[in-house]
């Protein structure tokens, strides 16, 4: 077991009850193009077209053969583009339940499939896009093979669902998915789970189980990769979400594309935080209708630390998100707030009274409690960074745009979510995730 000592479990109110309920009927779903790093789409449909679930909507020009398929049947109601015609979203108005059938196999045949068969099946169904590389967090190039594959069967994000509750309902499909993944690598398939949890064991010795304990980010796949299979420019691993492993298992044994998604709807502005069964790319306005407290709320696809805020073109459940978080928009001004004791404000430092109430849960809002200023190294970053990385030095070099030094300090091991806690505790209010992405893109382009 690997024990994580550094980190932070955010004391936020509104944790979900770990019970699964059916969510409301969803009338619009979307694929969000900006979730796929470096992807350039070649559109295969246009507005007004009728599509079936599993039908290809667009192909990646940079990776021919990588198809992005419809998560539901219906009509293409909008194709939204941003600056320089960057694809933002493809919106589908859900109608009926027609779907593309796929070839399927008996459970005992899965272990005999070739890697070419598995890759072809994943590519044509669109489930290949559930895989991501580390470094760079991109969709893998068809034909490539990773040193290992990681599945995080634990989640330490604030307000997250317990993955074991979800996996327990589909344990057979989960194990079938693991069998399929073993055909894609000569290395290990690492299943990482929380210490003390009962996990259904796979009989294939290629599948290994690793226990992690401690505060967030103990549940992040970046943490697991760092301790088990550190990456570099010459060593690449893949990772995939546990619900996508279930979908892969169902694809190969049933011949259908499963786009179900169980998410935690939680946060201080949710009336009854709970786990909801919905569908991939679901409209957030439809998913949260009638379930929120009155007021000006911010709906976030994903975690409050690293998720994506609701907007007109991004108001849908993200491909890689397992939760929907809702907090209050902090638009009001506070007179002399900087001299108040701050009983209801949380801080990692001893600057507010809230710091001393260890068991208190706080109704966090979007307030930043101050403006941007110079980066101040007072030890906050080191307190929440469990990886063997010089946090302050790395963050400084990221802000300075020093790619050589950032690479030497370990930035290739990181994704935006790995620096979310550094952003949260930063006295200078810097957003380190986008800065990291710019540096990674530059490193990749320069080779």
Curated annotation (Swiss-Prot):
| Broad enzyme group | translocase
Is the keyword Transport in the record?
A: yes
Reaction(s) the record says it catalyses = a ubiquinone + n Na(+)(in) + NADH + H(+) = a ubiquinol + n Na(+)(out) + NAD(+)
Per UniProt, what is one GO molecular function of this protein?
oxidoreductase activity, acting on NAD(P)H, quinone or similar compound as acceptor
Disulfide bond sites: none
What are the entry keywords?
Ion transport, NAD, Sodium, Sodium transport, Translocase, Transport, Ubiquinone
EC id? 7.2.1.1
Q: Which family does it belong to?
A: Belongs to the NqrA family.
Q: How would you summarize the oligomeric state and partners of this protein? A: Composed of six subunits; NqrA, NqrB, NqrC, NqrD, NqrE and NqrF.
Designated name of the protein: Na(+)-translocating NADH-quinone reductase subunit A
Species source reads Yersinia pseudotuberculosis serotype O:1b (strain IP 31758)
């Amino acid at each position: 077991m690997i024990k994580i000592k550094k980190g932070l479990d955010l004391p936020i109110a509104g944790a979900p009850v770990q019970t699964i309920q059916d969510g409301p009927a969803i009338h619009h779903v979307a694929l969000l193009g900006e979730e796929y790093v470096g992807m350039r789409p070649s559109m295969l449909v246009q507005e007004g077209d009728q599509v079936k679930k599993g039908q290809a909507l667009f192909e990646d020009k940079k990776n021919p053969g990588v198809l992005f398929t419809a998560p539901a049947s219906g009509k293409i109601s909008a194709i939204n583009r941003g600056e320089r015609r960057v694809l933002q979203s493809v919106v589908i108005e859900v109608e009926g339940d027609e779907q593309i059938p796929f070839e399927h196999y008996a459970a005992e045949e899965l272990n005999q499939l070739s890697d070419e068969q598995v890759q072809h099946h994943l590519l044509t169904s669109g489930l290949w896009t559930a895989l991501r590389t580390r470094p760079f967090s991109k969709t893998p190039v068809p034909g490539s093979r990773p040193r290992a594959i990681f599945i995080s069967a634990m989640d330490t994000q604030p307000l997250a669902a317990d993955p074991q509750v979800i996996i327990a309902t589909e344990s057979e499909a989960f194990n079938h998915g693991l069998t399929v993944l073993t055909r894609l690598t000569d290395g290990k398939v690492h299943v990482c789970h929380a210490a003390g949890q009962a996990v259904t064991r796979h009989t294939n010795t290629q599948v290994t189980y690793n226990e992690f304990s401690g505060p967030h980010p103990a549940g992040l796949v970046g943490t697991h990769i760092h301790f088990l299979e550190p990456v570099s420019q010459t060593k690449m691993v893949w990772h995939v979400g546990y619900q996508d492993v279930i979908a892969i298992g169902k694809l190969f044994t049933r011949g259908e594309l499963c786009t179900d998604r169980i998410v935690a709807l939680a946060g201080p502005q949710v009336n009854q935080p709970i786990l909801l069964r919905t569908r991939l790319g679901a409209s957030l306005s439809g998913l949260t209708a009638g379930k929120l407290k009155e007021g000006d709320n911010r709906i976030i696809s994903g975690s409050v630390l690293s998720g994506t805020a609701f907007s007109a073109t991004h108001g849908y459940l993200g491909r890689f998100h397992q939760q929907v978080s809702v907090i209050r928009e902090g638009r009001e001004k506070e007179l002399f707030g900087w001299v108040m004791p701050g009983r209801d404000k949380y801080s990692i430092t001893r600057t507010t009274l809230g710091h001393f109430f260890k068991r208190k849960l706080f109704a966090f809002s979007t307030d930043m409690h101050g403006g941007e200023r110079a980066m101040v190294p007072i030890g906050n970053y080191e307190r929440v960074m469990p990886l063997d990385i010089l946090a302050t030095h790395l963050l400084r070099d990221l802000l300075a745009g020093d790619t050589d030094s950032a690479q030497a300090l370990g930035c290739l091991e990181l994704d935006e979510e790995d620096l979310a806690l550094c952003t949260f505790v930063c006295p200078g209010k810097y957003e380190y995730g986008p800065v990291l992405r710019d540096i990674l893109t530059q490193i990749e382009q320069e080779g």
